[in-house]
Amino acid sequence: MNKNVLKFMVFIMLLNIITPLFNKNEAFAARDISSTNVTDLTVSPSKIEDGGKTTVKMTFDDKNGKIQNGDMIKVAWPTSGTVKIEGYSKTVPLTVKGEQVGQAVITPDGATITFNDKVEKLSDVSGFAEFEVQGRNLTQTNTSDDKVATITSGNKSTNVTVHKSEAGTSSVFYYKTGDMLPEDTTHVRWFLNINNEKSYVSKDITIKDQIQGGQQLDLSTLNINVTGTHSNYYSGQSAITDFEKAFPGSKITVDNTKNTIDVTIPQGYGSYNSFSINYKTKITNEQQKEFVNNSQAWYQEHGKEEVNGKSFNHTVHNINANAGIEGTVKGELKVLKQDKDTKAPIANVKFKLSKKDGSVVKDNQKEIEIITDANGIANIKALPSGDYILKEIEAPRPYTFDKDKEYPFTMKDTDNQGYFTTIENAKAIEKTKDVSAQKVWEGTQKVKPTIYFKLYKQDDNQNTTPVDKAEIKKLEDGTTKVTWSNLPENDKNGKAIKYLVKEVNAQGEDTTPEGYTKKENGLVVTNTEKPIETTSISGEKVWDDKDNQDGKRPEKVSVNLLANGEKVKTLDVTSETNWKYEFKDLPKYDEGKKIEYTVTEDHVKDYTTDINGTTITNKYTPGETSATVTKNWDDNNNQDGKRPTEIKVELYQDGKATGKTAILNESNNWTHTWTGLDEKAKGQQVKYTVEELTKVKGYTTHVDNNDMGNLIVTNKYTPETTSISGEKVWDDKDNQDGKRPEKVSVNLLADGEKVKTLDVTSETNWKYEFKDLPKYDEGKKIEYTVTEDHVKDYTTDINGTTITNKYTPGETSATVTKNWDDNNNQDGKRPTEIKVELYQDGKATGKTAILNESNNWTHTWTGLDEKAKGQQVKYTVEELTKVKGYTTHVDNNDMGNLIVTNKYTPETTSISGEKVWDDKDNQDGKRPEKVSVNLLANGEKVKTLDVTSETNWKYEFKDLPKYDEGKKIEYTVTEDHVKDYTTDINGTTITNKYTPGETSATVTKNWDDNNNQDGKRPTEIKVELYQDGKATGKTAILNESNNWTHTWTGLDEKAKGQQVKYTVDELTKVNGYTTHVDNNDMGNLIVTNKYTPKKPNKPIYPEKPKDKTPPTKPDHSNKVKPTPPDKPSKVDKDDQPKDNKTKPENPLKELPKTGMKIITSWITWVFIGILGLYLILRKRFNS
């Protein structure tokens, strides 16, 4: 064989083998059509915080090139450097009416849309892809920093600014946070970050964690990272066991069924160590918008207040990704309806389709109606060939259309695609008007309640429906008219719209103010005051004078009626009414509070007075008389909380002290009567008066001693007032553009609730002052803040009471304030902070704010767009934090004064019991008509009830607060001393045993030490009973098991013919506490121990556990320090500890599985085979 022939044959063989391989590869080469087919690329928002999210939206169509099988559109972003973007892994199908024509794949490094062969059947293709990405600013700096990341698709690009906040100097002790990793969108990561500053703690640390719906705990992912004096890392199945061994006394309890984790760390190990417990939850509901995790903490940092069950909840929003495509298929009519000016799609436009010749269109219908969807698209498929007419028959207001215009088109059997058309509508210049509603009050009440108006419209059938997007208007006291602006005058048919209002509550629910009736008539609402609820006080005069034996009984007596201690009426009572009296038509309430009525009697000569309720008994005691004193408080119902719980008064005889004193308090209705007084001295009539012994700070005292039957001691206190002044500053180059308004409205908020508004003008040099404001509310200082109603073209900045308005045409600002309606956090349920988000025209902006005490629960967003698509933007807020037990109401009426109110009704309880008599059915007739039962809250007397046979000797204290500052109140009962009876108290059952000559005494211990905050309270104390000031040797131990109370029984009632007075003294000296003993009533002796917390000594560092082989500390050099709440930093997979002994089973398995490398490898072997064949043939040829 010729050598050249051999070479030629080998070449041909090689060419035949290789050529098909390369041709096959070229047949499936995909095109990147990003530059030709992408029409727009945007991000929203355009500025985010480090670790925050933004939404990328890319739109495309086929106007610049037909889209084919295998074509791709790519979106790229920076994946390294100081600023980078990470996508969240998602795959979203692209469908047309249920048929998939491609898919969008989002990865951490980019997004790609790939089309399949089904897209080639479509024409007029347009679509979009929308997905979230995370932005990171990795600049190594402690100062604030902005970095710009550019996202591209073909020749389109958009920028997002990633802001890194200034590093803080302090941290919170505990917070709960979470996130979703870009590469793992099927799980949520959660972090419990405990003792972040490695502080010394005074108590054990307890954390409770409850995973909410839509997710399930994956225990295999749990790991614990400890830094500090006992640094270590625990992960895997044995993480909890290893941790508990290393930290004796610690406990981590996991309940997979309930989705809960409970953590306890002893005080010793909790000090100087920081703990981060990290785990993942598997998402079980992919459609859920957000995932919530609730957590509570109990701890106490050294020198700080104890935290008991404070909530630390966190929400992670699900990752959103969406994509869509539109096109026409054969036999399909598709209409796109859009705004002529803005090109925005118009929904709810109705069209009528018919054949030109009037024949059936399809399905035996000669006319078919189609309506546009939210994307402005209306379509119908499978139309037979023929000539058609499309007519628009209805469009939403304010769009106009020509009812007579026809849109003809033709469908042919030879067509490969359907018919697509775009129809544009212009907005009509709509007639608008302002609608005003009026409030009419009929009645005498000076202070009117706050009510709300909701606007409705009425059709021809008298059906009423709420006006869409009309604000609920608030009418505070003094406001009688409200207006809605720019409302349409006519409906879509040109008929005038009839507007009317209804009276509602803040939530928009129908309501009527308490104490009023209402009448709604169009745009006028009239509230008529109901007749004032009245009561009557009746009683009788009883004479104990042997039927006026000595003829001393007067013809009449004067009975005085006192309302809350102040004399308001007097009646002369005579025998004509059988000595009975009645005060009628008395107001039952004063400013919503029930009036306490009592009676007294002007002094009756030769008689001693005894008052029992409204029964006044006069006993003929020649030579004796009585005197009655009443305390009257004039302090605006104790507004500032300065009123004492009791005061002491002394009786004077002709100006000289008698030594006879009395304690006046709520339990005796602030009144007392002295009996058995000498009527004369040295032949002269004695005048009895009173003086107040208790000096009440801040009060002035006036004593009315005119009538010793009605001595009145008035204590007057003028509540403290304050004023709030400030100024309006204009930053607008001295009103250069003439946009400054003539006035602005400044709102005053008291504890977050708007109470007053002032119009501020240039006449006062733009300064303002709210005067005569109450400084306190129920004893607690009021926190005043100011806001401002929105000022067009200006951005507002509030610093204290200085309000600066900067002229920023096209920009505006929004201010939010949190208002708590929870009785000053009585139950301790209020969180330390809440998170709110700003909305623009009903859509979330991603702009959030944390509201807490440090910023007075208020925040202002500045630099906001004033308009969007030529329309004024309305900014509102929504609360992101779900506060358990609270209802939320958001007042979005004015974006300069957005108010989020959280209302919580404190829990109440009741204490009921009964009085049992052990006296042989009152054999000796000594049983009193009534007894006084005292209610003690945590050892302190708070209420007293008179118990009688009318209630079968049963009693009940209702509507009692269940908690005080978040701690459950311990209620107990005692009883005022009952003569000739011994008292035994078992829970709330009070038994009185008739023991003539014997009595009893009850002592209760009251602790005033902030619920034993510093742990100094002893477990028990010892008290001793005293008889007339002398120790009896009778002692008692008081502790928790006996509710810190004890009763001595079988005590002598008299000694040497005189009534014995029993008192107590405390034998136990409690270090750091001061002791006060209230010995006023031996049925209710109270020993109070008060403790003022002191700063503890320098703590001793705990020793490290003496484990011989502690776990090896992993290398965390690459670990990112936890960021503050709501900014969880990404922890790379490489940061997790690895077992270096594990090797891959097969190194080849680690190689990328690409078709090109397989082909190259195969070609290499073909070459070797051919070369071998060539050498064999050549050898034979040569031989």
Curated annotation (Swiss-Prot):
Question: Which residues get removed as pro-piece?
Answer: 1155-1183
Location of site Autocatalyzes isopeptide 1005-1089 formation? Answer: E1066
Q: Where is this site: Autocatalyzes isopeptide 818-902 formation?
A: E879
Q: Where is this region: Disordered?
A: 1074-1150
Compartments (UniProt record): Secreted, Cell wall
Indicate the annotated site residue(s) for Autocatalyzes isopeptide 728-805 formation. E788
Function (record text): Collagen-binding adhesin that mediates bacterial adherence to collagenous tissues such as cartilage. Participates in the infectious process by acting as a virulence factor in many different animal models of staphylococcal infections including arthritis, endocarditis and keratitis. Inhibits the activation of the classical complement pathway by interacting with host C1q and interfering with the association between host C1r with C1q.
One biological process term in Gene Ontology: cell adhesion
Q: Which gene encodes it?
A: cna
Which residues of this protein are annotated with the site description Autocatalyzes isopeptide 541-618 formation? E601
* Source organism: Staphylococcus aureus
Q: Where is this site: Autocatalyzes isopeptide 915-992 formation?
A: E975
Q: Where is this site: Autocatalyzes isopeptide 631-715 formation?
A: E692
CDD domains from the UniProt entry: CollagenBindB (cd00222)
Q: Which InterPro entries match?
A: Adhesion_dom_sf (IPR008966), Collagen-bd_Cna-like_B-typ_dom (IPR008454), Collagen-bd_dom (IPR008456), Fibrogen-bd_dom1 (IPR011252), Ig-like_fold (IPR013783), LPXTG_anchor (IPR019931), SpaA_PFL_dom_1 (IPR041033)
Signal sequence, start to end? 1-29
Description of how the protein assembles with itself and partners:
Interacts (via N-terminus) with type I collagen. Interacts with host C1QA.
Q: Where are the B repeats?
A: 533-719, 720-906, 907-1093
Instruction: Give residue numbers for sequence motif LPXTG sorting signal.
Output: 1151-1155
For this entry, the protein name equals Collagen adhesin
Q: Which NCBIfam families match?
A: LPXTG_anchor (TIGR01167)
- Its membrane topology, per UniProt? Peptidoglycan-anchor
Entry domain remark: Composed of a N-terminal A-region and a number of B-repeats depending on the strain. At the C-terminal end are features required for surface targeting and covalently anchoring to the peptidoglycan. The collagen binding activity is located in the A-region.
Site positions for Autocatalyzes isopeptide 176-293 formation, renumbered to this chain? D209
Taking the record's annotation, the residue ranges forming a coiled coil are none
